[in-house]
Amino acid sequence: MRAVLRLLSTHTVFSPIETIVSVFVLATLAYFHILSGIKHSSFFASSHPPAIRPAFAHLTNGEWVAVSQHDWTEAWKHPGGSLDALELQQVVFTLDDKTQPSAVLDASAISQHLVSNVPALSGKAYSSLCHHPNVSGTSCFTSVSGPGASPILTLSFKPGTRDDWLGSLRKEKTITLDGVKYDVGAGKRQESIGDMESSKWVAYALSALVLRFWELTKADSLDILVVLTGYILMHVTFMRLFLASRALGSNFWLSAGIFSSATISFLFTLPMCRSMDIPLDPIALTEALPFLVCTVGFDKPLRLARAVMAHPNILKPQDDGRMKAAGDVILEALDRVGNMILRDYALEIAVLFVGVNSRVGGLKEFCAVAAALLAMDRLMTFTLYTAVLTIMVEVRRIKKVRDMTKARSRSSSITAVTANGTAIRGVLSRKSSKQSVTEPETTKNLRQRATDSAIGVKGSLLKDGGRLQEAEENPMARLKLLLIASFLTLHILNFCTTLTSATANARHQRHPFRTVQEVVPIPRVDITTPAIANILSHLAVAQEPMFTVVGSEPIELLVKVAAPVYVHALPLAPALRASNTNTGEAIENFMSSWSSLVGDPVVSKWIVALLAVSVALNGYLLKGIAAGSGLAAMRAVRSQGVRFRSRARSIVKISDEPEPEPEHSIDPAPVVFFASAAPAVEAPAPAPAPEPEPPVNRPPPLTIFSRPLNLETVDKKLQDALPIRSPPPVEPITPESREVEPTQVEVRSLAECVDVFENGPRPVSVALKTLNDEEVILLCQTGKIAPYALVKMLADFDRAVRVRRALISRASRTKTLENSLVPMKDYDYARVMGACCENVIGYMPLPLGIAGPLKIDGLMYPIPMATAEGTLVASTSRGCKALNAGGGVTTVLTADGMTRGPAIDFPSIVRAAEAKAFIESEDGYATIREAFESTSRFAKLQKIKCALAGRTLFVRFATRTGDAMGMNMISKATEKALDVLSHEFPEMVVLALSGNYCTDKKPAAISWIEGRGKSIVAEAVIPGKVVKSVLKTTVESLCNVNTKKNLIGSAMAGSVGGFNAHAANILTAVFLATGQDPAQNVESSNCMTLMEPTNGGEDLLMTISMPCIEVGTVGGGTILEPQGAVLDLLGVRGAHPTNPGQNAQQLARIIASAVMAGELSLISALAAGHLVRAHLAHNRSQLNTPMPSRPHTPGPEDVSHVQQLPTPSASDDKGVTAQGYVVEAK
């Protein structure tokens, strides 16, 4: 377990500040997560539902009077009398909160849309469901308020028809009209606690919390007593922590560090429990909090603190006079007590798991939270808490040095230097010494004595010198474990058996919990509000013609006013919301957001706490620097200022001349030496000539002088003592300079290099750093280092590439690679190694061009193309221009499924047929699908196609693979599926995981018919005038060339999937630019290009069908930064955050659209006869064809024109007659 502990704590103890800051940042994020969960939970929500009941009104004698629902129902159920019933429904439109305060909303358009275009669920229009205010009229009673912040649409309905129409409206959910998006039911509602401001939220939360706790007054007094006892024990635990920390010499910081570690563990535990679906109730957490504190306890962090304080080198130097690094002190303390701490954690978590499996309500959740909290507390103890202890050790050392420096200055004592220049260690390096100066004990006043008697003497457990006395193991941990086990046992028995008459079930039955819903009435719609009263008055005016006498009784009106429906209006274009926003308002909004963030009650406290800790810690560190580690450092501070030196420079000898003896003898005084965290490695280097032995009385490398030093002189001597290394040449390396290069760089013999390699510092990469490249090449050439293991041995990607390049070059016949123009520098080889390529010697750059942009499904996309073919990007751009003029390209995804087709052998065709039938059956397919999809959360099996060839069964799995191209994913899933199939057919033999039934990287009719990867169909309409002006041809000519070339010509050639002009050209260029597998252009380029006239022959209708585009945006070449940057340009890099597979599908749509642009441009060029001229102008190599060529047969008279090519093999291959020669054409 020590290895595990060191793995967790090594980084934290040597980088404590970074660890603490990182953990506090994560804790802040966890706090925001918890805060969001609390604000949007139902705990603080109102205990009654926010629904509002409808109101009922009766118009009699020109006045509206509230009536009951029974009266309105009677008028509805018994029509034909003097009463007429109807329903009113108001639709309130609200603007987005981010719009300007002065913005208004015109609801006339959306109101007309709702009335005219939204039918009821039954299919009836609103006009047939509405209420007519008079008998002869045909218009409905509808009212719309004028433009404003919240306009209101009022609709009238016949009785019983409002719900039919309202259900249809709510089914719409969203309506987009005139650039505005309307969300039905998402408008203004009762403000929830999640929407409140910080101050209002705190007040509301406190009031809701008080009300919730007030509801607990009906709880049993025994339960309240148990909770009260728990809180008392929790505060006793806090007091024990404070007293134990004070006994270890810390009044505040140790206990604060332990408490902060536990608090952060609790903050991390709550989101973790939420993700694990452990129910968390604030009331239950409040009741369980004291028991959680007692369960976690602080005995384990205190045990680790005692082990640190008991370390012999916490304040005492080592034998070489240097202080052991604080991180090493913490790690050695962990080695001593870490296993016991882990044992206690494991036992407590194991006991809590018994409670988790007890199936007792309440106890199960408490034990689950407590176990998770203990696990997180264990992690924080070995990470955050160890970093805090490291800082405490450093601060304690600095404080001790400062106190001793003050004592020396009071006694006017200085540091003594012995005859050989070694400073005498003081009281910190001795347990007891007669020469040590004993500080006089100060007389404590009454207040100090009272404090010591009440809370204990500070540092009472520490020896003289500040080190903890050895103590036996505290039995408190075992006692706590026993109490937890007893608590769980009694709780389970008290719940499951009737030991007494006052069990938990009996108390619950005698005191049932009453909710607020039983006493709080549900509110009604208020008909006296101005919005409703105004509508009712308008209805009364419109209804006056109906108040005629029929017989002798006037017709009266009863109205049901339902709760309003809110519709949220959100402008789609950001410019609409921010059209009036100037720079000053933007800055004001930013400052307001920042003020609200900083004004958060917890964030502001974190900032203040961190600032206070930073100021206090910086004060200690600056005082420690000022105090120094000895009198010489203190004098240097006074005279020359503070200078920081690394350990590597401190070992350089300052002078070869002996220093004069000090004039005065000095008393011994303590001196503390601080060492860096990692020791410097001194590698053996060859010396050009032996040097004479130095004198015996030579001072050691590190000497503390009794007189002030001139820092400028010391710096000059240090620079002179450093070895001088010549910089590498900046001019290009030529073959001549390469030949003399070994004489310029001294190369050690093979024996010396092998000695450094085998006996040098470990790991081996450190030893190889002391060898130059030529010496490493020598080791590789002699077989000591394998070329494929250079990266592992050197631990340097760039150097490994450089060395491998030299090895391959010198072993080749031409020996030109080492100094060739193949680039090597400024490349991130870390992403390549182990993922994309092996035996890397550089990289091959390709020109990257951008065609377009092209409008695809309403959005503009640039088309990245990596190619070395001239006119390709320009031609594709011309096609994009023509397609954009016609409105762009529309694409559809018809299928998405990567395939893998293994070959399986059976002993007979009968068993092979049975296996085929099993796979194609419902039960067999379900079994294989379950096994297949268990290997990845992205692998979703679409279908299985089987085929028999003798005794061999071929199974073609088609799978959705998310945003990855999916070959690795589906191969792993296929292996799992075949393993499950072998349980049903043990005699089967898997011949090959890929039996070429996929078919991968090979042309095949099955891929053309069934599809593989993404199947895309694209369509576009190009106007005839664009065909003439941009493409310089006609619609009739294009259709004729396409039919004769792409369809008839390909059919004559017997092509499979090759019914196109040059789809592979564009597809491969995009593949190379976006990091796809270029080998898969074989099947991905399967394409059928169709053209036909439309709109009476005036325009051109063009379609592209590509059934097997195999692309991905995750893995493979997409991990390389250049290719990833191109995917960023398209907005499809990585996995889609919400819809897996959407990024890869979008990339396939872009590729198909780009192919359409390239096809359109090339066929137009063929139809117009521009192809040859374009290639002669843009894609013809002038160096290789200096003159226009024409048919010519060389004869005997042409021998004089024979020239020899300057090939590297010309000097080696004698008598070559055909190779290396060319005949000029005349």
Curated annotation (Swiss-Prot):
Residues 434-445, 1201-1210 have a biased composition (Polar residues). PROSITE patterns: HMG_COA_REDUCTASE_1, HMG_COA_REDUCTASE_2, HMG_COA_REDUCTASE_3, HMG_COA_REDUCTASE_4, SSD. The active site is at E869, K1001, D1077, H1175. The chain crosses the membrane at residues 17-37, 224-244, 252-272, 337-357, 373-393, 481-501, 1150-1170. Keywords: Endoplasmic reticulum, Lipid biosynthesis, Lipid metabolism, Membrane, NADP, Oxidoreductase, Steroid biosynthesis, Steroid metabolism, Sterol biosynthesis, Sterol metabolism, Transmembrane, Transmembrane helix. NADP(+) binds at S936, R937, F938, D963, A964, M965, G966, M967, N968, M969, I970, S971, N1179, R1180. This is 3-hydroxy-3-methylglutaryl-coenzyme A reductase. The lineage of its organism: Eukaryota, Fungi, Dikarya, Basidiomycota, Agaricomycotina.
